Each structure stands twice: as C-alpha cells, then as structure tokens.
C-alpha cells in the first residue's frame, strides 16, 4: 500500500471484536462504556459503536465534539475548557 497523506487503515473485523470485548467487560462490571474517540475521528467508525448500543462518547477538544455532535447527543469533553473557545462551544450547543 502506498499513501501520500495520512490515511486511516483499519481491520474492521478486529476492531469490531475489540469493541465487543470492551462492551462485554463494561457490562460484566455494571459500567457504561463511554469510549474516547481520539484516534479514529470517523463518523463511520463511530456508527459501529452506535450499532453495538454505545450511546455516549468522550473527545479531547471542542472541535472534536463539534465534529461528532451531528451524530451523538451525549459527548464529554475530557480536557479543561479554554475560555477563548467559549463562543465556539456556545454556538455548537445552540446548533444541536
């Protein structure tokens, strides 16, 4: 494979098996799985989680929350708020 730009290459069956294992561990421990959507940043992969019953996610920035906000209602931003981004955050909340 030759790629000229950064490209996400993923084995779907391995990823879905890993997701099933994470869900199983959470269920066995009476926990809610709230995965951190950091590396894949993909609506399609996010939908794999939804199809398995995941309803909440964590991201690392307001821009990532904005990216996923059209598909997800329960998003936690796992980093302190930068006060300079408050206008962006308020706009995102109003749009969704």
Task: Label the predicted regions.
Residues 8, 16-19, 31-33, 81-84, ...:
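Generic detector of leucine side chains in alpha-helical contexts
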Residues 5, 31, 49-51:
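Short, basic, glycine/proline-bearing loop/turn elements
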Residues 10-11, 33-34, 53:
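A generic structural signal for short
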Residues 1-10:
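Generic N-terminal amphipathic, Lys/Arg-enriched alpha-helix
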Residues 14-44:
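N-terminal glycine-rich anion-binding loops that anchor highly charged ligand groups
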Residues 36-96:
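Active-site-proximal beta-alpha core segment in soluble small-molecule metabolic enzymes
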